[in-house]
UniProtKB/Swiss-Prot annotation:
The active site is at H69, D341. The gene is pho4. It comes from Schizosaccharomyces pombe (strain 972 / ATCC 24843) (Fission yeast). Its main location: secreted. One of its GO terms (molecular function) is thiamine phosphate phosphatase activity. This is Thiamine-repressible acid phosphatase pho4. Glycans are attached at N98, N104, N186, N221, N251, N328, N433, N439, N458.
């Protein structure tokens, strides 16, 4: 049938005024801030899982929080050899300002023209420190956790287990102020665990409390080789593309490219915006994200033989406290621990979160495969967390559920919740005895002590 001109016009008009939902996929915007690896600002992951509401006909009985510190300044490095360190970035910034790295300000629409009037916010003297936004993140999270689990807060004082680094302790304090306000000092008992081998299996910095792993630099060479391979693939094309924005005769090195990127991401962490980020394309941000993911996959993560050892002690402690809750062997209901991203990933690996990445099948280092489980941007952004919930449901059975950054991480290896549907829950005994985690839930502490030749300790902590 041949349509008249007026019919075509009416058809076009009706399409314009119709709902757009069927074509929204073509209009999705790329949010680069959600893809900055472990330096990402806090955001919820993209699990598309069940609702975070408490399951119907279930009562919350325990909550366990494993919490990363909030947004921070770059870490310190007195030798200024680490490209991501505050000292290295500070030196690079000065080179941009004094012309040692010569921006071509006469190049039309140079995205670096702002450098003429730019005042750096990254300072070497602030290395390692929690940022103001990091304090706000933790305060707000503390408030939200208290409101969500209010019925469990029925004792006078709560243990706050924290790794010893200042930014972690500060984060724990701000979180506690969010929970208890001015009454924080009276409501908390801070247990500060050293970040060295004296903490043994109680550590919240397992890399440093495992002498065999730390002293022998296990995973260091394989991780560096993975980075070298991948950076040889993706960094040089960025340097070639950006060279035109600098005076002729100056060619960016791959370290220069990484420095520009780190200024971008840390300015985002410190003040939520950065003109340097306009230098990079969406694909390039995803490739930097992959570089971060390689780090946490190979260094104590699921691509390492040591992941279940390093994460298993926490998992065993968690499992023991879940069992005590069921057996009425303890009246503790709230378990709080504050740590680093490098602690959380091995724990999640020991829990079976990354089944597609193994020592036998690690992430490739010659290409970005995009569809893989361990996205550090989603699992351990600044202020990232892992929450474990224990429920007693109307069928008189106990169930477990995990939340990652306040979104349900659906458990698929141990059955279903009381609804009989895939709702992210597992019945407790099935959860503890699932083949993906039973070695950690049952033997994690013993494995850590024996394989690490860890120091014994008389301190008892509860995660």
């Amino acid at each position: 049938m041949k349509l008249s001109g007026i019919s075509l016009w009416l058809l076009a008009a009706s399409i314009v005024h119709a709902g757009k939902s069927q074509f929204e996929a073509f209009e999705n915007e790329f949010y680069f801030k959600d893809h900055l690896g472990t330096i990402s600002v806090y955001h919820e992951p993209y699990f598309n899982g069940p609702t975070t509401s408490f399951p119907e006909s279930c009562a919350i009985k325990q909550v366990h929080l494993l919490q990363r510190h909030g947004s921070r300044n770059p870490t310190g490095d007195d030798t200024a050899t680490d490209v991501s360190s505050a000292q290295y970035i500070d030196i690079f910034q000065n080179k941009l300002l004094n012309g040692s790295i010569p921006v071509n300000f006469s190049y039309p629409e140079n995205p670096l023209y702002f450098v003429k009037h730019w005042t750096p916010v990254i300072k070497a003297e602030n290395a390692d420190q929690l940022s103001s936004s990091g304090r706000i993140e933790l305060f707000d999270l503390g408030r939200q956790v208290f409101e969500r689990y209010y019925e469990l807060f029925d004792t006078d004082v709560y243990d706050i287990n924290t790794a010893a680094q200042e930014r972690v302790v500060d984060s724990a304090e701000w979180f506690s102020y969010g929970m208890f306000g001015d009454d924080m000092q009276n409501k908390t008992n801070f247990i500060v665990l050293p970040e060295d081998d004296s903490a043994g299996a109680n550590s919240l910095a397992m890399y440093y409390s495992c002498p065999v792993y730390e002293d022998n630099n296990i995973d260091e060479n394989t991780t560096e080789a993975a980075h070298t391979s991948w950076r040889n693939v993706f960094l040089k094309p960025i340097a070639n593309r950006l060279n035109k924005y600098f005076d002729s005769g100056y060619n960016l090195t791959v370290s220069d490219v990484r420095s520009l990127y780190y200024i971008c991401v840390y300015e985002i962490a410190l003040r939520d915006n950065s003109d340097f980020c306009s230098l990079f394309t969406p694909s390039e941000f995803l490739n930097f994200e992959y570089d971060s993911d390689l780090d946490y996959a190979y260094w104590g993560g699921p691509a390492s033989e040591w992941a279940s050892t390093l994460g298993g002690a926490y998992v065993n402690n968690l499992a023991n406290n879940l069992r005590k809750g069921v057996n009425n062997a303890s009246d503790r209901k709230v378990f709080l621990a504050f740590t680093h991203d490098s602690q959380i990933i091995p724990v999640e690996a020991a829990l079976g979160f990354f089944p597609d990445i193994t020592p036998e099948h690690p992430l490739p280092t010659d290409k970005n495969i995009f569809t893989y489980s361990l996205k550090t941007s989603s699992f351990v952004p600044f202020a990232g967390n892992l929450i474990t919930e224990l429920f007693l449901c109307s069928d008189n059975k106990y169930y477990v559920r995990h939340l990652v950054n306040q979104q349900v991480y659906p458990l698929t290896d141990c059955g279903y919740g009381p609804s009989g549907a895939s709702d992210g829950l597992c019945e407790l005994s099935a959860y503890l005895n699932s083949s993906v985690r039973v070695n950690s839930t049952s033997n994690g502490i013993a494995n850590f002590n024996s394989q690490c030749q860890a120091h014994s300790t008389n301190v008892t902590v509860y995660y």
